[in-house]
Swiss-Prot record:
Residues 216-231, 398-408 have a biased composition (Basic and acidic residues). This is E3 ubiquitin-protein ligase Mdm2. InterPro entries: Mdm2 (IPR028340), MDM2_mRING-HC-C2H2C4 (IPR044080), p53_neg-reg_MDM_2/4 (IPR016495), SWIB_MDM2_dom_sf (IPR036885), SWIB_MDM2_domain (IPR003121), Znf_RanBP2 (IPR001876), Znf_RanBP2_sf (IPR036443), Znf_RING (IPR001841). It comes from Xenopus laevis. Residues 206-215 have a biased composition (Low complexity). The gene is mdm2. The lineage of its organism: Eukaryota, Metazoa, Chordata, Craniata, Vertebrata. E3 ubiquitin-protein ligase that mediates ubiquitination of p53/TP53, leading to its degradation by the proteasome.
Amino acid sequence: MNLTSTTNCLENNHISTSDQEKLVQPTPLLLSLLKSAGAQKETFTMKEVIYHLGQYIMAKQLYDEKQQHIVHCSNDPLGELFGVQEFSVKEPRRLYAMISRNLVSANVKESSEDIFGNVCCFPDKQSSQKEKLQELPDKLIAPASDSKPCNLSQRKSSNETEEISSVDHPAEQQRKRHKSDSFSLTFDESLSWWVISGLRCDRNSSESTDSSSNSDPERHSTNDNSEHDSDQFSVEFEVESVCSDDYSPSGDEHGVSEEEEINDEVYQVTIYETEESETDSFDVDTEISEADYWKCPECGEVNPPLPSYCPRCWTVRKDWLPEQRRKEPPPSKRKLLEIEEDEGFDVPDCKKSKLTSSQDTNVDKKEAENIQNSESQETEDCSQPSTSGSIASCSQEVTKEDSSKESMESSLPLTSIDPCVICQTRPKNGCIVHGRTGHLMACYTCAKKLKKRNKPCPVCREPIQMIVLTYFS
């Protein structure tokens, strides 16, 4: 993309050729800067001023390497000229204001106004005035012929149609205003950065833009061949002008046509900011105290108790879960049988002890002798014929049974002697079994009713597995 391509962008935004070629005269300081960049004249067009200004910035390498749209001019005469330390080419209003303060328009409007007045006052002499109109664009374009060669005959015809259309429709030319400024950036692989900007305030009528667009392709083709390479691309920004009707306090809202409203585009940008939700943070939980926090042994980070790892170094917390104990395999049936055969029970001590074969025989002999003694005593008691002895023996048996019952009742717990908790009549002989434990608190009949109705144990609320009828001896 070169100067011609940028000109094409400007013309597509309804900027006429006459406004592009308006001559301006820079101040002495700005003129010296432009001449150091290769300028050889004293009057320039607006496009030429910005072109040479871009060449100056590029030669001095005042642009930022990372952000090329920013120009640093604090230690340069350009900063003294504009009165700033740095500026951005993405701010066309500011750039246009800084440049326009150092420009003076050339005094070339008097001849054009006289010619336009003669055409309006003397319609009979239009044929002679057309020749003067053809000579006027030559005078305007002649100072800029060194930097931009173009087709003279094509430009004459385009300028003639523009001037006639502006004379025929002066009111329509005043009514239509241009509301946006065109600002183009051009990037080159070899030069890295340069800028050309066309800024204006007035918009011409639709007839003048149509005639100028028909005369532009040939001029674009000649300039494309003589300027820079084709490896460049342009970025165009549309911004509101300072001189437009929207910014003037006395602007007429009804002076904008429907075509201009259609051409204007509005972009809406919505920016969303992501924030951490308060529910994700552990600091909100007031139940967690400082003693519950744990310190990572690797990085020393103090972490909340909930995650099992350190969020900084991903180290798993020690003793997070208890160690799994290995279950020992159950002993086989053969080993159990061997243990039962080898071990016996000592009755008075209730301790397991191994019995030898000699001890087994002695135990058997003692048991046999005890049985014989008891039988001999019974026979002797029965052989006595006296009635007094029989009555005494019977009384002794009754007293023995009563004493045995009393001893049994004293040996039983108090809870088993009490009646059933549910019916309060029958004894507690129904044991409610659940797992390896049971509760004796009801009779067998009431306990069976609880099991049939799928009720839990009244004591521990565990599901009932079975009911066992219990006997007390």
